[in-house]
């Protein structure tokens, strides 16, 4: 018996049902890699960031997330080179979906009990996504803006429902506005740290502040 179509599990009807000691025998999620491209690129190398944002409250299967990841990665490698971007899938499939297997052969009514004891066995995993939640993000150089939009547009076709593409006003994957970012780094209020930054507040021990600005 094949996998049941994901349209059967599209809507968030039940409470979150994660893998636990009570919910065992869950098959592994299809998506294993959540970061692709040049993951270790410094924060100042990729200022542009594009998001795919969900416009529906629904469930996205791990197979769909994997398909979208592959699709976006393939296009970005072709258009920007394998070291010209960093893709991050922002959803993780933790919700377990179940299936109550029914026999469809002759004499099945003698072998099974129909809807008696209909709590199913784990079949796979899905990610629950809210309206306005980011599904996937890509950071890259400013000249690759059109490529980011096209990569996310192609990846959208792998998902049910409606998604929007949003070019962020923030710098890369950080939470700071792009127009203020370079000034804050120059003032040493932000310290680059891998693909993120450390924020140095204006309060705290004076000795620390003096050591930083000396």
Curated annotation (Swiss-Prot):
Location of the protein in the cell: Cytoplasm
GO biological process: embryonic brain development; liver regeneration; negative regulation of apoptotic process; negative regulation of transcription by RNA polymerase II; regulation of translation; translation
One Pfam short name: Ribosomal_L16
Keyword set, alphabetical order: Citrullination, Cytoplasm, Developmental protein, Isopeptide bond, Ribonucleoprotein, Ribosomal protein, Ubl conjugation
Positions of crosslink type Glycyl lysine isopeptide (Lys-Gly) (interchain with G-Cter in SUMO2): 175
InterPro entries named among the record's database cross-references: Ribosomal_uL16, Ribosomal_uL16_CS_euk_arc, Ribosomal_uL16_dom, Ribosomal_uL16_euk_arch, Ribosomal_uL16_sf
Residues recorded as bearing Citrulline in the entry: 32
Cross-link Glycyl lysine isopeptide (Lys-Gly) (interchain with G-Cter in ubiquitin), where in sequence: 188
Main location: cytoplasm
GO cellular component: cytoplasm; cytoplasmic side of rough endoplasmic reticulum membrane; cytosolic large ribosomal subunit; cytosolic ribosome; large ribosomal subunit; nucleus; protein-containing complex; smooth endoplasmic reticulum
Example GO molecular function: translation regulator activity
Top-level taxon: Eukaryota
Post-translational modifications: Citrullinated by PADI4.
Family under the similarity heading: Belongs to the universal ribosomal protein uL16 family.
Known function: Component of the large ribosomal subunit. Plays a role in the formation of actively translating ribosomes. May play a role in the embryonic brain development.
NCBIfam families: PRK04199.1-4 (NF003239), uL16_euk_arch (TIGR00279)
Assembly description: Component of the large ribosomal subunit. Mature ribosomes consist of a small (40S) and a large (60S) subunit. The 40S subunit contains about 33 different proteins and 1 molecule of RNA (18S). The 60S subunit contains about 49 different proteins and 3 molecules of RNA (28S, 5.8S and 5S).
Protein name: Large ribosomal subunit protein uL16
């Amino acid at each position: 018996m094949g996998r049941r179509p994901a349209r059967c599990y599209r809507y968030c009807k039940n409470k979150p049902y994660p893998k636990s000691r009570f919910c065992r025998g869950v098959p592994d999620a299809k998506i294993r890699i959540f970061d692709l491209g040049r993951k270790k690129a410094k924060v100042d190398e990729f200022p542009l960031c594009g998001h795919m944002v969900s416009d529906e409250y629904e469930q996205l299967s791990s197979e769909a997330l994997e398909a979208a990841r592959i699709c976006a990665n393939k296009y970005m490698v072709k258009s920007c080179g394998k070291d010209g971007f960093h893709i991050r899938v922002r959803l993780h499939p933790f919700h377990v979906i179940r299936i109550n297997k029914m026999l469809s052969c002759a004499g099945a009514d003698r072998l099974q009990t129909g809807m008696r004891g209909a709590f199913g066995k784990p079949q796979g995993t899905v990610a629950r996504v809210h309206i306005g939640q980011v599904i996937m993000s890509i950071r890259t150089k400013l000249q690759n803006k059109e490529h980011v939009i096209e990569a996310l547009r192609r990846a959208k076709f792998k998902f049910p429902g409606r998604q929007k593409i949003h070019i962020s006003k923030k710098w890369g994957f950080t939470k700071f506005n792009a127009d203020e970012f370079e000034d804050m780094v120059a003032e040493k209020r932000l310290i680059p740290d891998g693909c993120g930054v450390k924020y140095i507040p204006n309060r705290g021990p004076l000795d620390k502040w003096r050591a930083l600005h000396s």
